[in-house]
A protein has these predicted regions:
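Short, conserved charged micro-motifs
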Residues: 147-153, 196, 361-367, 410-411
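Short, flexible loop/turn elements at secondary-structure junctions
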Residues: 76, 114-115, 145, 288, ...
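A short glycine-rich beta-alpha junction/loop motif
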Residues: 131-139, 152, 171-196, 347-354, ...
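Non-catalytic DNA-recognition/assembly elements of restriction-modification systems
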Residues: 1-56, 191-312, 406-451
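Short coil/turn segments at secondary-structure boundaries
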Residues: 57-64, 86-87, 169-171, 241-245, ...
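Short, ligand-facing micro-motifs at secondary-structure edges
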Residues: 78-90, 109-112, 116-134, 152, ...
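Sequence-specific dsDNA recognition surfaces
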Residues: 41-60, 76-106, 282-330, 344, ...
Length: 451
């Protein structure tokens, strides 16, 4: 047989050999780029069956009423831990009857096959008396013999790089990426070890996940302490919220009504504002600039290094220019998350938001103002106006009262909060590193046992 001499300078993966006996149905190079012939494998179809989900019938929609019937979507899938059904949409009994053959059951595996490709979720702890219907953007995988294959072990296999690379190579890359059921069933799975070996690997993963979650919980506890610390430093005591019927029926003198807000919610919530304390308070517009963001559409975007800050809690895309250099606060202007407070110490392109920054850093440090506004987050959410598309307007933000200690006190508070955030960030990084290392070791155990 002829020999092949590949240049040592050729980057790994740009040229490789595949035996003709190893080619099955496809001859495109990309599909075999990550092929590992040394892994003893079998097709998924030998171990499990599949069924696609189903879209809501024409003329049917979700219901706002709580029912025993839920519709499971890609967005309801969790990367770690048990399935979270709390965000599932409700459907009516009539809709369920039409879709009953697409029901999910305990220990089914779900794989996303449209849009976001390759997410894997084991269905666990279905709420009592609830029926779950699967979206058309997913398919369910049902194990043929649970006495030979633990569902959790198969879930771990499907999340390995070995399988995920096959999934990406098998998908159709169109405007909306798609993955055919036949391609999923054709996935090559490392041979399955005895159940006791499966259980050992699962146990190791669960221990790593538990350790990760404990570190994340410690980090969140630290972050949650920031509000209490800041309020204590400012000498502000939060009033206890009373939502009893008697407290919700009240009278207001006309002299107390001002600013054009005559609705009962504004008058009720004003008693729960975070203001006062041991330092003087100033209206926000007296001590800070409030500027509207610059309108931009997806057609105007030129991919670049600067995150576009719009109406959500994350940046939807990046642009090639910025309109603020950093050290600014954004408050989302519209949408479900209108009022969301976000501090940026880096350049941004501010779009559907209000941009806030200090008029005088010697009097008010912008980063300190950001921490105060985060404490007032719920108060700011209550400024939302409009039903279909809620908005938070700059004129309403301008009226917020801001406690204003002297600059050294602001600096002390900022330093303490930064230390808390740094400690929390370290714990979060350790948590992800711990799990990442465990996943790599587990994948090696799974693949190593199949060689």
């Amino acid at each position: 047989m002829a020999t092949f001499d590949f240049s040592e300078k050729l980057p790994f993966g740009e040229m490789f050999l595949v035996k003709s006996s190893e080619i099955e149905g496809r001859i495109d190079v990309g599909f075999y780029q990550h092929y590992q012939p040394n892994i003893n494998s079998i097709k998924l179809s030998k171990l499990a069956s599949m069924q696609g989900g189903k879209r809501l019938p024409k003329g049917r929609d979700y219901t706002d009423d709580e029912t025993d019937f839920l519709y499971f979507r890609v967005s309801d899938m969790e990367e770690y831990g048990n399935t979270n059904f709390e965000n599932c949409k409700f459907i009516t009994a009539e809709t369920y009857k039409e879709l009953a053959r697409y029901e999910l059951f305990e220990d089914d595996l779900v794989i996303s096959i449209a849009g976001t490709i390759g997410k894997i979720q084991r269905i666990k702890s279905i709420p009592q008396d609830k029926k779950i219907i699967l979206t058309e953007n997913c398919a369910k995988i049902s194990i043929k013999d649970v006495n030979e294959l633990n569902p959790e072990y198969l879930c771990l296999i499907l999340k390995t790089e070995f399988v995920q690379q096959q999934i990406m190579a098998s998908s159709i890359q169109t405007t909306i990426p798609k993955l055919g059921l036949d391609k999923v069933l054709a996935l090559k799975i490392p041979v399955i070890p005895p159940l006791d070996v499966q259980d050992e690997i699962i146990h190791r993963y669960e221990n790593a996940l538990l350790a990760r979650n404990n570190k994340l919980k410690q980090a969140q506890t630290l972050l949650n302490s920031i509000n209490s610390y800041l309020l204590g430093e400012l000498g502000i005591t939060l009033p206890e919220t009373d939502n009893s019927l008697n407290s919700r029926i009240f009278t207001v003198q006309m002299s107390e009504v001002g600013g054009g807000a005559f609705d009962p919610f504004t008058q009720f919530n004003k008693h729960y504002r975070i203001e006062g304390g041991k330092y003087p308070n100033e209206r926000l517009d007296n001590i800070a600039f409030l500027q509207k963001g610059q309108s931009i559409t997806s057609d105007d975007i030129v991919s670049g290094d600067y995150p576009v800050i719009a109406g959500g809690q994350t940046s939807p895309y990046s642009h090639n220019v910025c309109n603020h250099k950093g050290n600014v606060i954004t408050v989302s202007a519209s949408g479900a998350y209108s009022g969301y407070v976000w501090y940026h110490d880096y350049p941004i392109f501010a779009s559907d938001c209000t941009v806030i920054f200090s008029k005088d850093e010697n009097e008010l440090i912008t980063e300190f103002l950001a921490e105060v506004l985060k404490v007032k987050q719920q108060e700011i959410y209550l400024l939302q106006k409009g039903a279909g598309q809620p908005h938070v307007y700059p004129n309403d933000l301008a009226k917020l009262n801001i406690p204003l200690p002297d600059k050294p006190t602001q600096q002390k508070i900022i330093a303490h909060i930064q230390a808390i955030k740094a400690q929390a960030a370290t714990l979060q990084a350790e948590a992800e590193q711990l799990l990442s290392q465990a996943k790599a070791e587990i994948e090696q155990m799974i693949l190593g046992g199949a060689q």
